[in-house]
Amino acid sequence: MSSLSKEAALVHEALLARGLETPLRGEPLARDTRKAQIEAHMTEVMRLLNLDLSDDSLVETPSRIAKMYVDEIFSGLDYANFPKITIIENKMDVDEMVTVRDITLTSTCEHHFVTIDGKATVAYIPKERVIGLSKINRIVRFFAQRPQVQERLTQQILVALQTLLGTKNVAVSIDAVHYCVKARGVRDATSATTTTSLGGLFKTSQNTRQEFLRAVRHHV
C-alpha cells in the first residue's frame, strides 16, 4: 500500500494492530480487472437463477452490479479511496466536546450482502488537533462502504479518528436497521441495533459519557 496517503496508511496500520481491520487478502486487483471478473461471475449467478440475460431489463445488470460494488457500495475496501483529511492545529484551544449527530450511513451486512441502513453520532474532545467537520462524515462513509458487521464498523470509526486526531477522547454510536433481519429470516421490520464505542474520557468520566449519550438521544 505504498501509494496511499499518509493518513490512510496510519489508519490501516492502527486497525491492523488492534485486530479491527476488515479481513482482506492483500493488495487489491486493478479496478477494471475487479469489475470485469465480478461481471463475469454475476452473469453466471444470474444464469443459475434461471434469469434470461437476453432480456433488455437484465442484459446490463451484471455490469451495473460490478460497477456498483467497486465504485460505490464496496469502495471502502480500497484505501486508495480514503478521504482526503484536513487536520487543523487547535489554535483556539477548544477543549469542549465537538459532536456531529445524525450522520446517515448505508452499509452492507457481510453475512448476507444485504443493506444496513442507519445513522451515526460522533464526538471528540480536541487536544492539539481539530478536524474539518465534513471529514468525520466522510470517514463514517468510507468504513460503511464495505461488507460490515456493525460492531466492527463502530470501532473502526473510533480508531480512525483517534489516530488522526492524536487523542483517545472519541466516542461513536450507530443506530441501524439490518435488512438481513428485516427482509429475511425472522423478518422483523421494526427492530434496530445500537452499538457504541467509547475512548478516553468518554469511557472513564461518567459526566462526559452521559453528555455524549444525551447527545445521541438528542436530549441536549
Curated annotation (Swiss-Prot):
One of its GO terms (biological process) is tetrahydrofolate biosynthetic process. Its EC number is 3.5.4.16. Pfam families: GTP_cyclohydroI (PF01227). PROSITE patterns: GTP_CYCLOHYDROL_1_1, GTP_CYCLOHYDROL_1_2. The keyword DNA-binding does not apply. GO terms for molecular function: GTP binding; GTP cyclohydrolase I activity; zinc ion binding. Zn(2+) binds at residues 109, 112, 180. GO terms for cellular component: cytoplasm. PANTHER family: GTP CYCLOHYDROLASE 1, GTP CYCLOHYDROLASE I. This is GTP cyclohydrolase 1. It comes from Edwardsiella ictaluri (strain 93-146).
